[in-house]
Structure formats: C-alpha cells, structure tokens
C-alpha cells in the first residue's frame, strides 16, 4: 500500500527558489471525504477512483501566481484516521490556512466538522484561515448534506464555504486561491494594522507609490 | 472505509512512507531556509548601505535613508513609525490601500517579513511563545524519533529492537537512519515520541469517525506496560537537557541551528537599523594588538613562495557582538628563510578595509615549524551589519631575526555573503594559502582616503629671488619665507564602526638639517568627512630649504581615553625620495609641490591620496 502511495506522489518538490513566498496549507477532514483526491486534482490535475488511504501525512508543492506574486504552496494532506492524530496535529502549528473537508454524501463526515474545527482552534495559531469544503458535489443523487446546511455551519464557525468536486474538477482551484487570498489578507493585517495609525504621513504629490506592489486584493 | 490491515505489515510500510515524507519535507525546508538566508542577507546589505552613507557626511538633520538635508520649513521630513527615523518624502513608500507609509528600509523589512513568513511566526508566537520559529513538525518528528532511538540504544529496551534486516529493503536514505539502533522500532514509537511533545490531547481527540480506536496503542496497554509513555517522556527530557550532540546533527532544516544563536534573525536586524557600536576596550581580548605598527604595513617584507594551508573557523557571537576567528593550525607552510630552513610562523588578521593597527589581530609566534598549531581566537567587536562591507584577511608570516618578516601566504574571506547562521560555515575549515593579489594593498600603499590642501609659498620678494637662490646653501632662515598650508578637509577616511571620527591633522616639515617643525590642527569631533579648514604656517623657511625638505601630513583619530590616537593615513610632499617605511609621494603630488615652490605667493590646490 505504501508503494501505491509513493507512486501517487511525485518527488520533484525541487530546489526551485523562484517564488516570492511560501504558504503552508493543511487539508483535514474525515477519512475518505476526498482530501487526497482534492489535492491531486489541484496539484496534478488527476483523479483516481480507487481509494488509497493516506498514511499519516503527505504533501505536495505547487507554485501559483497570485496578485502579482509567485506563491509556493506546500499543501499537507493528512490521514483522517484517529490513529494518526498525534502526527497530523503536529502539523497544525505550521499551517497558515486549512481546508476542512467533508463529503456531501456522508452525514458523519459533516457531523465531524465541528470537532475538526475544535482541533484547529486547539493546535493552530489564532488567526488560522479556514475554508469549509463540501466535496463530491458531483454526486448529487447521493447527497445527504444540503448546501444550505453546509453554508450555515460555515457561517456559524466563521469559515468561508465552497462545494466542490475533485472528480469533476469543480471549485478546486477556486478553493485554494480563495484560501491564499484570505491568508494574504491576514498577512497584510498583521503587518500593517500592528502599527498605530501613522501620524505625519503627509502625502506630498511626489509620493512614491510606484514602489508599492500594484495589486488589488492583498497588500502583500 | 478504514481498512483492517495487519499491524505488522502496516507498521513497516507506514514507517517507510512517513519517513519518506519527512525527508522530502526536509529538502523543501532546506531550500526554504536557504532562500530565507539570502533574503536576509540582502536586507542586511540594504541596511548597511543606509548606514554607510551616514559616514559620508554627518548631519544633524538629514534623512536617515538618503542623507539628504532636511529643511526647517520645506521637506522637513517625518518620522517613520517603523524605525523612528526621520526621513525625507522621497524615502517613503505608501502602503496599498492605506495612507500609512514606511521608510524604504522598513518597507523592505516588511517585504522580508512577508517573504520569509516571519509575519506568521510572529503571529503564532502570540499563542505559542515557545515554539521555535522555523521549527517544523517534520523536523521535530525526525528529531524526536532519533532521540527516542538513541535512548533505546542506551537503555536495554523492552521489547528489544527488531533485527536490522527489517529495513533492508528501504531506500538509501532510510539506511542512513538505520544506523540508529532504534530505527526498527515500529512507527508507534514515532507517534509516541511526538505525543510527548504535546499537551494532553483534548477531548476532541476522541474518535470522530468509525475508525478503529488507537489500534497501535492497544497491544501496548495489553502488554501491561503503561509506563512506556512516561519512559519515552523521560528519555526526551533527558536528552534535551543534556544537549547531546545528536541535536546538533544536521537532521532537520532548522533544528540543528537552534542551539546556537541564529544571527540573521529579523528582530536582530531591525533592532539596529543604524550601526551603533564603536570599537571599545573589549576588542583587545584574546589577541595581541600591536599599536603604532601601521607603518610596517607599508614597509618592506620578504615573500616566500606561498605553499600550504591554514585551518580556521569564523563565528559571530550575537551576545557579545563579536566576530571570532579561531585559528587552529597551518600545514605545509613555506620556510620563512628557505636557505636556513627556518620558519617561525604567526597569523595576522585584518577586517578589510580597515588596516589600521587597531584592526590588527595576531596570534603568538610558533618557533621552528611549518606545521604550527595555534588554537587561538582572535576577536573583533563589531556589529554584524557592519561585516557586510568587510573582508577578513588572514595572513601568515614568518618572524625572522631583527623582526624581519616574511609573508607566507594569505586568505581573504568576503564576509558579505558569509552565513553566520549556518553551522557548516561556522566549522573549522582548511583554506589554501595564496600569494598576495597583484594589486594587494599590503605591498602597495593603501588608499586611506583623500586630503584636500591648499598651499602657498609666501616670499617677501618676487619669484626672481627664488630662482636666484643658491642650491644647497639653504640655511638662511633670515630670508623669512613662509610656507602656508590650509588643510581643507578629508574624505573616505577609514571611519570607526559608528561611521564617524574625531580627527585631526599633524603637519611635520623636515628641513634638510633634519630639524622638524611640527604643527597640529584642532580635533573635529564626530565627523566622517572632516573639514578642518585649518592653516599651518611654517615660518622662516627658504625656497632652497624647502626643495630639500619634506612635509608629512598625517591624519589621526583621537583616542577616546587619550592613550593611542589611531593613525588614519598620511601623505608626503617634498622632493626628497621616500624614506623606507614612510609615506610615499605620488608623482602627481610631486608636480603639485613643485608648482607650489615655483609659484610663490600663489595658492595651489591639491588633493593628496592618503596612505
Ligand atoms: N464522486 C466523487 N468521488 C470522489 C471525489 N473525491 C474523492 N472521491 C473518491 O472518494 C474516495 C476517497 O478519496 P480520498 O481522496 O482518498 O479521500 P481522503 O481519505 O480524504 O484522502 C476515493 O475513492 C475517491 O476516488 C469526488 O469529488 N467525487
Ligand atoms: Mg487521503
Ligand atoms: Zn531620503
Ligand atoms: Zn523606517
């Protein structure tokens, strides 16, 4: 089984330094909700219907271009099984953002969301950015968790919400990019609002704005 | 969906899979650490550039970034919230979507925080203050796994480790780990050891799924060894406290550096936006300093054919702000005196470009050996940021009879790119000794800046008298000529580490009868580019005397406690040829000096290169 897993993961994280910064993202959720598939869809644009249970932890890297910056994402895929919990929670502290996933065809996985959220609160930093993702939305016929319930829970927990499908490649890219953006926002916030309002900022006409990075969404 | 796999086979595959991941992660983290080091080095340079310009001209009210003078009404500058320095409007960068701005350096600082992820570590520290900055879970896992393994190898383990052959099929990387005796402990130990790093798991740790509960724990508890967990707890604590060497092994990307003080950390840089240390008495420890030996640097020395190597280590101690060069040994040195097969080597260092005697450190002299062992640490008290502009020169010399010195070779290490955070670069290394570079400043006079002077020969009569003056009979002070010299100012002087000097000029006119007329300017405090505008007037000299005289102008940095003023550089004017070991006269200066003598009562401006 391990060899199957190994084969699924490529090994060219590469020594490429051609990026501006690195974000670490963790995907969590019950076993078999589609975390690994989701990551493979995003990183490799591939999908396998066969289920290969993830051993402990694994990761992939992907460099994206977002807001005029090259951002290297190290995306950690975790095993949902409790027996790996000690290992997986060890990775919570290093993550800037989380994708918390459930399976819209699996009630139990949805019920566990609250507990996963508690895990994040316990093991991660206070400003952890979380996106709630209801996966397998291609399986409309077998849906047991309505979009509305998903959205309500997300609101309740203060997370943003997406329904997605790793199989049909729905909202996969969007999920990651949105997560990157909210992390960027958090970053700007922590860097710039830490300073008290600047007093003597006389904005002369010669203000050197061209040095500021020219993008709309985040000041990073 | 949870599959029921037999525990034994699962453990082995799990172990392999997880270690694979840990190693892959380590590679990513190593790359990342390297990138971050590069970034921080660049920021350091930027800061240094800002700081260096302070030395160009010291001004009360100038922009901290570009040194532009700030006005009282217009362009008064404003204080940057980040660093509290006053900067001009050009040196501000406005942040997107805000009216807030930062100075160029703080802006870069912010960029670096983004790029290094330090913003995150700072935020995270609010919740986990003890968490190592770049310490990753993977590094910790590897570390704790290893610690656990070590522990098991010391204390006879229960149950005994499995046989080595179990990891036989693993990839080479895993074999490497296989040398740790505990390697074959199942991955459960890995989990257990991680568990000990964490606080008690919250209630939410309880199973959320239908997955089997702690399958890996079950057999243990049945075996009736509940103390296992605490045992491994102790193991880790002991190891940590004892600081055993395995922590230092380059296992994780960050963890090995933990024990040393990481040098290029963000906060260290930001806490010293402007260089603020000066050389102090502390710099004398651990090394011999020869004062007043500046001239020997320009003086004569022999050169042997350079052979051999020197072993030393370079470290920076953040706590004491000192650069430490640990000189260990040399081998295969050339004989200082080839015919007599004699060699009494010693090692000398400078932090170039400073070649003043205060910047010199020497080891003791070893007698009659070409394989000397020194084991001496030479120290410089210097801000880390300052080092970006410096090169470490380590040279080996033979001390012969009558203090005759023979150059045996040197190594020049540019410190700008030196990674003081890296353990590798802190360790001892052999460096091949090299001959002096062609244009080496040690064999040629050093350029220690320029001195601007204005000179005039004042004669009561016209130039005719000068031409008629008989050669060689110049002992006629009655002619009452005067040599007027205005020392205007100097620039590019070897400044102190705070970028300033308390400098003064000495003028010494040596007449043909070796009589010396000496004058001294007042001290100009806290200036890197002093403008003394001070007049030296040498009275009662005749043109013929002057043509056989020499005028030496030397610049000094006044010692704070008045012991030894530091020689900054000097220049010589005069037709007399160079004295051995003395300052040199450049041909251009010669021409200018001739002009002074041949055009009495007229001012001649000249720029003298200081050596
Ligand atoms: N129909 C459908 N199946 C999916 C989707 N994502 C994953 N799966 C399947 O669900 C099973 C578990 O997926 P996996 O990614 O291994 O789940 P993980 O345990 O959370 O990593 C596999 O058989 C996948 O093929 C999806 O979006 N749609
Ligand atoms: Mg998986
Ligand atoms: Zn400025
Ligand atoms: Zn500033």
UniProtKB/Swiss-Prot annotation, chain A:
InterPro entries: P-loop_NTPase (IPR027417), Rab3 (IPR037872), Small_GTP-bd (IPR005225), Small_GTPase (IPR001806), Small_GTPase_Rab (IPR050305). Specifically expressed in brain. The modification Phosphoserine is found at residues 188, 190. The modification Phosphothreonine is found at residue 86. Its cofactor is Mg(2+). The modification Cysteine methyl ester is found at residue 220. It holds the Pfam family Ras. It is found in: Cytoplasm, Cytosol; Lysosome; Cytoplasmic vesicle, Secretory vesicle; Cell projection, Axon. A motif (Switch 1) lies at residues 49-58. GO terms for cellular component: axon; cytosol; endosome; lysosome; membrane; plasma membrane; postsynapse; presynapse. CDD domains: Rab3. One of its GO terms (biological process) is sensory perception of touch. GTP binds at residues 31-37, 48-49, 53-54, 80, 135-136, 138, 166-167. It is a lipid-anchor. Belongs to the small GTPase superfamily. Rab family. Interacts with RIMS1 and RIMS2. Interacts with Rabphilin-3A/RPH3A and Rab effector Noc2/RPH3AL. Interacts with SYTL4. Interacts with RAB3IP. Interacts with SGSM1 and SGSM3. Interacts with SYT1. Interacts with MYH9; this interaction is essential for lysosome exocytosis and plasma membrane repair. Interacts with STXBP1; this interaction promotes RAB3A dissociation from the vesicle membrane. Interacts with SNCA. Interacts with GDI1, GDI2, CHM and CHML; phosphorylation at Thr-86 disrupts these interactions. Interacts with MADD (via uDENN domain); the GTP-bound form is preferred for interaction. Switch 1, switch 2 and the interswitch regions are characteristic of Rab GTPases and mediate the interactions with Rab downstream effectors. The switch regions undergo conformational changes upon nucleotide binding which drives interaction with specific sets of effector proteins, with most effectors only binding to GTP-bound Rab. This is Ras-related protein Rab-3A. It comes from Bos taurus (Bovine). The lineage of its organism: Eukaryota, Metazoa, Chordata, Craniata, Vertebrata.
């Amino acid at each position: 089984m391990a060899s199957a897993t190994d084969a699924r993961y490529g090994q060219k994280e590469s020594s490429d330094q051609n990026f501006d910064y690195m974000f670490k993202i963790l995907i969590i959720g019950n076993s078999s909700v589609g975390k690994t598939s989701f990551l493979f869809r995003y990183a490799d644009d591939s999908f396998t219907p066969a289920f290969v249970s993830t051993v402990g932890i694994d990761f992939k890297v992907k460099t994206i271009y977002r807001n005029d910056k090259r951002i290297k994402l190290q995306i950690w895929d975790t095993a949902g099984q409790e027996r790996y919990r000690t290992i997986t929670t060890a990775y919570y502290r290093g993550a800037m953002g989380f994708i918390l996933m459930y399976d819209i065809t699996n009630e139990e996985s949805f019920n566990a969301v609250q507990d996963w959220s508690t895990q994040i609160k316990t093991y991660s930093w206070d400003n952890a950015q979380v996106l709630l993702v209801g996966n397998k939305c291609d399986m409309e016929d077998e849906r047991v968790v309505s979009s509305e319930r998903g959205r309500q829970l997300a609101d309740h927990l203060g997370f943003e919400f997406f329904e997605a499908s790793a199989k049909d490649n729905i909202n996969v890219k969007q999920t990651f990019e949105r997560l990157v953006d909210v992390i960027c926002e958090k970053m700007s916030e922590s860097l710039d609002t830490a300073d008290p309002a600047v007093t003597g900022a006389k904005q002369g006409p010669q203000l050197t704005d061209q040095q500021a990075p020219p993008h709309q969404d985040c000041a990073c | 969906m949870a599959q029921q796999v037999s525990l034994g086979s699962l453990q082995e595959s799990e172990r392999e899979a997880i270690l694979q991941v840990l190693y892959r992660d380590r590679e990513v983290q190593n790359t990342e650490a390297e990138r971050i080091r590069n970034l921080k080095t660049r920021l350091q340079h930027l800061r240094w550039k800002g700081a260096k310009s302070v030395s160009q001209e010291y001004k009360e009210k100038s922009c901290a970034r570009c040194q532009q003078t700030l006005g009282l009404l217009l362009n008064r500058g404003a204080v940057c919230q980040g660093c509290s320095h006053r900067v001009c409007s050009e040196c501000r960068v406005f942040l997107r979507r805000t009216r807030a701005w930062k100075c160029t350096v703080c802006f870069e600082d912010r960029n670096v925080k983004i790029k290094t992820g330090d913003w995150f570590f700072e935020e995270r520290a609010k919740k986990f203050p003890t968490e190592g900055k770049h310490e990753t879970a993977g590094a910790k896992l590897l570390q704790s796994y290893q610690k656990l393994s070590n522990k098991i190898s010391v204390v006879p383990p229960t149950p005994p480790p499995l046989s080595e052959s179990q990891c036989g099929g693993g990839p080479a990387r895993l074999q490497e780990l296989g040398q740790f005796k505990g390697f074959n402990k199942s991955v459960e130990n890995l989990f257990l050891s991680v568990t000990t790093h964490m606080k008690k798991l919250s209630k939410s740790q309880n199973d959320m799924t239908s997955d089997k509960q702690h399958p890996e724990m079950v057999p243990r508890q049945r075996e009736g060894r509940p103390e296992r967990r605490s045992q491994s707890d102790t193991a880790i604590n002991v190891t940590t406290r004892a600081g055993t060497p395995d922590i230092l092994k380059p296992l994780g990307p960050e963890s090995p550096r933990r024990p040393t003080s990481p040098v290029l950390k963000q906060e260290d840089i930001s806490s010293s936006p402007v260089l603020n240390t000066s050389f102090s008495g502390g710099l004398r420890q651990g090394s011999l300093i020869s004062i007043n030996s500046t001239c020997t640097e320009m003086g004569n020395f022999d050169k042997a054919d350079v052979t051999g190597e020197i072993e030393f280590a370079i470290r920076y101690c953040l706590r004491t702000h000192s650069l430490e060069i640990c000189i260990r040994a040399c081998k295969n040195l050339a004989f200082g005196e080839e015919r007599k097969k004699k060699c009494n080597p010693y090692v000398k260092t400078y932090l170039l470009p400073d070649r003043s005697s205060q910047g010199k450190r020497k080891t003791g002299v070893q007698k009659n050996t070409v394989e000397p062992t020194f084991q001496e640490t030479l120290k410089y008290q210097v801000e880390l940021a300052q080092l970006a502009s410096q090169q470490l020169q380590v040279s080996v010399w033979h001390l012969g009879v009558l203090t005759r010195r023979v150059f045996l070779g040197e190594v020049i290490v540019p410190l700008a790119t030196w990674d003081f955070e890296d353990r590798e670069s802190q360790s001892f290394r052999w460096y091949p000794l090299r001959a002096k570079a062609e244009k080496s400043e040690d064999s040629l006079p050093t350029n220690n800046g320029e001195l601007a002077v204005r000179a005039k020969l004042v004669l009561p009569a016209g130039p005719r008298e000068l031409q008629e003056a008989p050669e060689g009979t110049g002992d006629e002070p009655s002619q009452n000529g005067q040599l007027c010299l205005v020392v205007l100012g100097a620039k590019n002087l070897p400044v102190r580490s705070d970028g300033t000097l308390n400098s003064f000029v000495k003028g010494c006119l040596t007449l043909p009868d070796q009589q010396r007329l000496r004058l001294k300017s007042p001290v100009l405090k806290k200036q890197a580019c002093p403008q003394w505008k001070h007049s030296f007037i040498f009275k009662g000299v005749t043109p013929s005397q002057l043509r056989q005289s020499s005028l030496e102008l030397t610049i000094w940095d006044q010692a704070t406690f008045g012991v030894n003023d530091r020689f900054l550089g000097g220049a010589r004017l005069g037709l007399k040829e160079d004295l051995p070991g003395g300052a040199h006269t450049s041909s251009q200066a010669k021409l200018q000096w001739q002009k002074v003598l041949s055009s009495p009562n007229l001012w001649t401006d000249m720029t003298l290169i200081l050596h």
